[in-house]
Amino acid sequence: MDGIFETVAFFSGRPLECAVFEALRTRILGRWPQTQTQVMKTCVRFGDPRPFAYVSHPPRKSMEGLLLTFSLRAPQAQERYFMVVPVNSRRSTVHVLLQSPGEADGWLLGQLEQARNER
């Protein structure tokens, strides 16, 4: 995992995003303890060692929360999906906007488990 300083710098001035990230990271590490995070310029990567999910700031400054991105082969329509972007005929990129720490729940971990298995 990257150092605390990189994580603090990435979420500087964004307390809600930081709280959502910590809840998500705690749930992911509870399910997959070998998972590592890497803080990059525009996102934080979750991998073990290959990446399976990314979190980033929302696309618009007026939006609150944290954007979680992962890839699925055949995502079923879900109202919690913020956006689904087809990459090709067999794969789509899924974006989920997390607006509270409680949204890092069992349903979301199931989606991430599917993304981990399909990469």
Listing of model-derived features with the role each one plays in the protein:
Residues N88-R119:
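Well-ordered alpha/beta subsegment
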Residues Q38-H95:
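Short, conserved beta-strand/beta-arch hydrophobic-aromatic motifs that form part
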Residues F10, R27, Q111:
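Residues that form generic nucleotide/phosphate-binding pockets
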Residues P15-Q34:
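Amphipathic alpha-helical segments
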Residues M1-R14:
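A short, surface-exposed helix-loop junction/capping segment
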Residues S12, L16, S100-E103:
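A general boundary/transition motif marking the beginning of the first structured unit of a protein
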Residues V20, L24, P51, L108-Q111:
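Amphipathic alpha-helical interface surfaces
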